[in-house]
């Protein structure tokens, strides 16, 4: 299969999911609808919908159900982004002003709440006509995902005032904050098509490993990425005091003088550009390659998970492998 064929496959999924998102995210109150739909207008990679629909296709699943379930996870994802931007006080997302910057915090909180409700509405529509056990499994993993995402975000925030965060704690945090929704997406692709427990387990593991790899690369791009390409400020993780794998590794490897520079910049809202750049240089020196190698390890694990699933659709298999590889090759 050529890259053009895979691109057509992905575009078909994205267009169909976008159409359903637009139909779900409607409100009688215009301002609420605009604020809720704002981040969708800026595009986004739609990786979670691609994972869900490709996972469904992999086992010969129902496309219409998959599109609606994919809309549910993407709406849920955007809900978390709206609230994350408030918590992190970020002014840009995907090159656009964040919802709280454009409409104010009260409306942004309401928009997040509205998206949260709409995500459940979309999932409910996806599950219509299915038996009670399947309905229960799908809603259980969706609800559990929200709980674990919240716990992951809470862990991330709690790390900001610590310098002793371990790699194990970091991995646990990103499993919750980021990887859980990828895992949920892949699992739902199996659950809505009544896949057996072994298949759902392997899809779950695929999504989890892909999500861990994705977040590690996200943290890397926050240090070395291009601001215009990313659509958000670089160095914001340093300014916010985030304990990414790069910071954790650097603190364990750097000289005492380098540590002093890094610690004085971490979490310093008043840090100047040259301070942030110096801290970035120290991080690149000590942890950039390590972080890339770690991301590749989890990307490889995701691909390995796919080898244990009976395949009904070769295109979907290639798509899922590509998505795992894309996580470590992307520039935004």
Swiss-Prot record:
Pathway per the UniProt entry: Isoprenoid biosynthesis; geranylgeranyl diphosphate biosynthesis; geranylgeranyl diphosphate from farnesyl diphosphate and isopentenyl diphosphate: step 1/1
Requisite cofactors: Mg(2+)
UniProt-recorded Gene Ontology molecular function terms: geranylgeranyl diphosphate synthase activity; metal ion binding; prenyltransferase activity
Keyword Membrane listed: no
Reactions mediated catalytically: isopentenyl diphosphate + (2E,6E)-farnesyl diphosphate = (2E,6E,10E)-geranylgeranyl diphosphate + diphosphate
Binding site residues for isopentenyl diphosphate: 45, 48, 77, 94
EC primary class: transferase
Pfam families: polyprenyl_synt (PF00348)
Ligase as UniProt keyword: no
Amino acids binding Mg(2+) 1: 84, 88
UniProt entry keywords in alphabetical sequence: Lipid biosynthesis, Lipid metabolism, Magnesium, Metal-binding, Transferase
Disulfide bond entries: none
Binding residue positions for an all-trans-polyprenyl diphosphate: 93, 177-178, 215, 232, 242
Cofactor comment text: Binds 2 Mg(2+) ions per subunit.
Record-listed E.C. numbers: 2.5.1.29
Gene3D superfamilies per record: Farnesyl Diphosphate Synthase
A Gene Ontology BP annotation from the UniProt entry: geranylgeranyl diphosphate biosynthetic process
Physiological role: Catalyzes the condensation of isopentenyl pyrophosphate with the allylic pyrophosphates to yield geranylgeranyl diphosphate (GGPP) which is a precursor of the ether-linked lipids.
Family statement: Belongs to the FPP/GGPP synthase family.
Protein name in UniProt: Geranylgeranyl diphosphate synthase
Lineage: Archaea, Thermoproteota, Thermoprotei, Sulfolobales, Sulfolobaceae
Encoding gene, per UniProt annotation: gds
């Amino acid at each position: 299969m050529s890259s053009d064929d895979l691109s057509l496959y992905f575009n078909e999924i994205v267009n169909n999911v976008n159409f359903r998102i637009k139909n779900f995210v409607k409100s009688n109150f215009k301002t609420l609808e605009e604020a809720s739909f704002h981040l969708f207008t800026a595009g986004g990679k739609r990786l979670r919908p691609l994972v869900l629909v490709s996972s469904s296709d992999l086992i010969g699943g129902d496309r219409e159900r998959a599109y609606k379930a994919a809309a549910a996870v993407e709406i849920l994802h955007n809900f978390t982004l709206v609230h994350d931007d408030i918590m992190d006080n970020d002014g840009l997302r995907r090159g656009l002003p964040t919802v709280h910057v454009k409409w104010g915090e009260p409306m942004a909180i309401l928009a997040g709440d509205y998206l949260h409700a709409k995500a459940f509405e979309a999932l409910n529509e996806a599950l219509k006509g299915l038996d009670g056990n399947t309905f229960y499994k799908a809603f259980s993993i969706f609800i559990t995902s929200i709980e674990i995402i919240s716990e992951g975000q809470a862990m991330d925030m709690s790390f900001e005032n610590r310098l002793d965060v371990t790699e194990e704690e970091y991995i646990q945090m990103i499993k919750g904050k980021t990887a859980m929704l990828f895992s949920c997406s892949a699992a739902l692709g199996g659950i809505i098509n009544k896949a057996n427990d072994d298949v759902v387990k392997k899809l779950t593991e695929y999504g989890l490993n892909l999500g861990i790899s994705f977040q590690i690369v996200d943290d890397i791009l926050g240090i070395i990425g291009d601001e215009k390409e990313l659509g958000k400020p670089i160095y914001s993780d340093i300014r916010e005091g985030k304990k990414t794998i790069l910071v954790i590794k650097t603190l364990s490897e750097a000289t005492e003088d380098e540590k002093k520079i890094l610690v004085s910049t971490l979490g310093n809202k008043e840090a100047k550009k040259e301070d942030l750049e110096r801290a970035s240089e120290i991080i690149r020196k000590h942890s950039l390659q390590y972080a890339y190698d770690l991301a590749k390890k989890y990307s490889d694990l995701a691909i390995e998970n796919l080898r244990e699933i009976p395949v009904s659709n070769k295109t979907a298999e290639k798509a899922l492998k590509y998505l795992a590889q894309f996580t470590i090759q992307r520039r935004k």
